[in-house]
Amino acid sequence: MMKSILAALDGSAESLAGLEQAVAWAERLDADLRALFVQDERHFVTYPTYTDSEGTVPKPIPLSGKAKERAEAEAAREESELYSAYERAIKGRAVRGEFRVVRGLVEHTLVREAHAADLVVLGKRGRGLDESVEGAGPTTETMIHEALRPVLVVPKGGVTSGPMLVPFDGSHGVQRVIVPAVELASALDVSMTVLTLAERRSDGEALQAPLRAYLKSHGITGDFRVVEGHDTERGAARLILGAAQELHAGLIAMGAFSVGPLREFFVGSVTREVLTHAPCPVLMMT
């Protein structure tokens, strides 16, 4: 059962939307909430632009003087703003939580902290990224691939209530994400639509059969759909996104890659396309 939720914060609108979702899930699951702001240690050093006589770049140099004061003041301001956002998010909610600040390499620190959590919640993209790029940020992609935990990716202003959509191809990632997906669906008491792409309907139904039994044993109402035919990666992503729009889905649960016997349905490009345009949070595991 999910008893520990890690919410990664960086001040972006997406991370604050993720915090709201993390608080809601912590309350519904009666789980502990750990809100974490990682101060990027790279903001407190300067990088030499030269190489030494052997052609190697010297180690970064810690900031000093006014530059250090400005960096520390900015970090303190961000910490204060995020703590205020955290307090607002938990106000009046039955949540056991803590707000922590650590300094380190962001991705490395979050991956390490994720090992003490049952669920990681973070925004689709972090602060400071080029607004013209719609896709998930590098920290989000790193967490999906390396956290070894289910990762809930939250867009800014997305739909957060409604049935759950599970694009199912039998791959390792989607098989692993089914367990936390079922727990979340049970907590929300929502139905689950399982969508499979197969060359023949019989292949898709055979692939779905064990999942039918699994959902039934957990009391989850499942709507099983098979789409026949061949499809491109972009077409597969459109299929998922179209189903999410049709269902007014509140969550998509999927694996990040496909290793199944049918044609590849969920690969890196499909993952990115869904994360970029999903109208709701996406729960992922590799």
Functional labels for PLM-detected ranges:
Residues 82, 86, 139, 143, ...:
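A general structural detector for well-ordered alpha-helical segments in enzyme core domains, enriched
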